From Swiss-Prot:
Superkingdom to which the source organism belongs: Eukaryota
E.C. designation(s): 3.1.4.2, 3.1.4.11
GP-PDE domain location: 228-485
Location of region: Disordered: 582-607
Gene3D superfamilies on file: Phosphatidylinositol (PI) phosphodiesterase
Name assigned to this protein: Glycerophosphodiester phosphodiesterase domain-containing protein 5
Description of post-translational modifications: Intramolecular disulfide bond between Cys-25 and Cys-571 is reduced by PRDX1.
Topological domains, Cytoplasmic: 1-42, 111-125, 182-192, 518-607
Origin species: Mus musculus
Cellular localization per UniProt: Endomembrane system; Cytoplasm, Perinuclear region; Cell projection, Growth cone
UniProt cross-references to PANTHER family, sorted A to Z: GLYCEROPHOSPHODIESTER PHOSPHODIESTERASE DOMAIN-CONTAINING PROTEIN 5 (PTHR23344:SF6), GLYCEROPHOSPHORYL DIESTER PHOSPHODIESTERASE (PTHR23344)
Subunit structure: Interacts with PRDX1; forms a mixed-disulfide with PRDX1, leading to disrupt intramolecular disulfide bond between Cys-25 and Cys-571.
Ranges that cross the membrane: 43-63, 90-110, 126-146, 161-181, 193-213, 497-517
Catalytic activity: a 1,2-diacyl-sn-glycero-3-phospho-(1D-myo-inositol-4,5-bisphosphate) + H2O = 1D-myo-inositol 1,4,5-trisphosphate + a 1,2-diacyl-sn-glycerol + H(+); sn-glycerol 3-phosphocholine + H2O = sn-glycerol 3-phosphate + choline + H(+)
Length: 607
């Protein structure tokens, strides 16, 4: 009777098992392989890198446009007919997808670092394709439907590029450990040269990126202009329902420079404040008068409009995620808000703030279609509100407006040639923050034209515009921006130059050190060991050399351990092949103790 014990025993490799198991479901030792990665799996790795780049760009873009989330929701409301905050779910989904892809990429890089064969599991491949397709569709949709918003990406880079550059240097320096390992393992000089040239071309490209960075916040502190004046967009819509008395009062409590309002005229000729064409979003008209829900707000009498509640929607939809922060008294006050008339706003703001007024055209069959401008002007003049504090944005019949109210600040909402602006006696421009460059701001200032930019909610954007010298901004988030004491960062050019040159030198020194260390660690390794000879779960091409090497390792351990029979002591090349084929599914396992040799014990009874 013959009893056999295992030829070898290997210690468990939990980290390696988790690495290959999570990435390719290769949890067992015999499933892992140090063979070269197949071309197909290399293609999947390339696809993984591309997906990572796209999801990173998309996530950064979606974070960058958080200043315009309300605008995005408003756009979808006009398309879909009901209000919902889509921005946060998209942000959460994008972050989750990026985290998943980043995790797969880290696992793949770890495979390369330890010399394991890449074999992405089919479930991960499906997830990769779904995320890639979804990201491409999302980016294409934004490019077609929200094209101007891509300019926000470039604007945000003016504020973040100096710091993203430092992060990129950290990443490329860490990646050099893997590249240096591949360089050290490469046996051909041509392969080493290719790896070296390609990697350092990328590295030096990263080092020179700061030469292309231009930011208004890279400036001398003494050149920083005054803080931009703040204009409350429809009051303070993050603290109270927009276009209500409470909203304007909250804005005035912050001592803002001005208030912005959209003026509509009722069926019986009363100017009131409303941004939407209908009343569905900002009132309870669907509950109180369902038959009037889709009728234009301008086609209702003021007596009907006064009966509507203009505050409950704010608590229900919570458009800015701020309703929970209201005090109990503010919560009760919000529930009792009604539509605000122009006369109420004029009385509230008189002597306290300037007004940026925009008129909305009534429907074609409105009785005041031809005279709504005169009615509005008369209401402003009758209130006694100081004319020099009114910024008049409505672009039609400006000669009539200048005649009736010569003190108004004529404000244009479009970019035009300077000759046309002067011809129209334009004193101020009201533009979206993506429509004007730093150089254009300087040009307008030299022409004695003041510029107001809308809608600026994020502190980073406010800081960037502050450094650029913007005179004033319109904001939903005035209560936060009013407390910003200075730009989030400002750096003299000399200090910035010193910072990025120092960072480049440190990175380069570390990379050289890593290459030297990896060459010293791995450059002399040319022999096989039992840990590096494993069978792959995938079908591989047969290799006579590998089979013979396995047999040599096994029989060298047998000869060192105990005596064996003559039948096993002499092996020809053909016996190697026969034995290898018979044991093609067996994998040796590592030593029980580090540095110990595997032992074989063969006991034969009757001999």
């Amino acid at each position: 009777m013959v009893r056999h014990q295992p030829l070898q025993y290997y210690e468990p490799q939990l980290c390696l098992s988790c690495l290959t198991g999570i990435y390719g479901c290769r949890w067992k030792r015999y499933q892992r392989s140090h063979d070269d990665t197949t071309p197909w799996e290399r293609l999947w790795f390339l696809l993984l890198v591309c997906t990572f780049s796209l999801t990173l760009t998309w996530l950064y873009f979606w974070w960058g446009v958080h200043n315009d989330y309300d605008e995005f929701n408003w756009y979808l409301y006009n398309r879909m007919g009901y209000w919902s905050d889509w921005s946060v779910p998209i942000l959460v989904t994008s972050a989750a997808a990026f985290t998943y892809i980043a995790g797969l990429l880290v696992l793949a890089l770890c495979h390369i670092a330890v010399g394991q064969q890449l074999n992405l599991h089919w479930i991960h491949k499906m997830g990769l394709v779904v995320i890639l397709a979804s990201t491409v569709v999302a980016m294409s949709a934004v490019a077609q439907l929200w094209e101007d918003e891509w300019e926000v990406l470039l604007i945000s880079l003016q504020g973040t590029a100096p710091f993203l550059h430092i992060g990129a240097l950290v990443a490329i320096t860490a990646l050099s450990w893997i590249v240096a390992g591949q360089f050290a393992r490469a046996e051909r000089s041509s392969s080493q040269l290719t790896i070296l040239c390609t990697f350092f071309a990328v590295v030096f490209t990263f080092y020179l990126i700061p030469l292309t960075i231009s930011s208004p916040c890279i400036m001398e502190k003494k050149d920083l202009g005054p803080k931009p004046a703040l204009i409350g967009h429809r009051g303070a819509p993050m603290l109270a329902p927009e276009h209500t008395v409470m909203s304007f009062r909250k804005a005035l409590e912050q001592r803002l420079y001005g208030l912005q309002a959209d003026i509509t005229i009722s069926l019986d000729g009363v100017p009131f404040l409303m941004h939407d064409t209908t009343l569905r979003r900002t009132t309870n008209v669907e509950h109180l008068f369902p038959e009037l829900a889709r009728r234009p707000a301008a086609m209702l009498n003021w007596t009907v409009l006064q009966r509507l509640n203009a505050g409950q929607w704010f608590l229900k939809t919570d458009p800015f995620w701020t309703a929970s922060s209201l005090s109990p008294s503010d919560h009760r006050e919000v529930q009792n808000q009604s539509i605000c008339s122009l006369a109420e706003l004029l009385e509230l703001a008189k002597g306290n703030a300037s007004l940026l007024l925009n008129l909305r055209d009534p429907p074609r069959d409105h009785p005041y279609r031809g005279s709504f401008l005169n009615v509005t002007l008369e209401a402003v003049l009758r209130s006694g509100f100081p004319q020099h504090q009114v910024m008049w944005l409505f672009n039609r019949q400006r000669p009539l407006v200048r005649k009736m109210a010569p003190g108004f600040q004529q404000t244009s909402g479009s970019k035009e040639a300077i000759a046309n602006l002067r011809k129209g006696h334009i004193q101020k421009l009201n533009l979206r923050y993506t429509q004007v460059s730093h150089q254009e701001l300087r040009d307008y200032a030299s022409w004695n034209l003041s510029v107001n930019l809308y809608t600026v909610n994020a502190p980073w954007l406010f800081s960037l515009l502050w450094c650029a010298g913007v005179p004033s901004v319109t904001s939903d988030n005035s209560h936060t921006l009013s407390r910003v004491p200075s730009p989030l960062w400002i750096m003299p050019p000399d200090e910035y130059c010193l910072m990025w040159v120092t960072a480049d030198l440190i990175s380069f020194s570390l990379i050289i050190g890593i290459f030297v260390l990896q060459k010293w660690r791995l450059g002399g390794i040319r022999s096989y060991n039992p840990e590096q000879i494993m069978l792959s779960a995938a079908v591989r091409r047969t290799s006579r050399d590998v089979s013979i090497m396995k047999e040599k390792l096994i029989f060298s351990e047998i000869s060192d351990g105990v005596e064996v029979s003559d039948e096993l002591s002499v092996c020809s090349d053909s016996s190697y092949d026969t034995y290898a084929n018979a044991n093609s599914t067996a994998t040796p396992v590592g030593p029980r103790n580090a540095g110990s040799r595997a032992k074989t014990v063969t006991e034969q009874s009757g001999h």
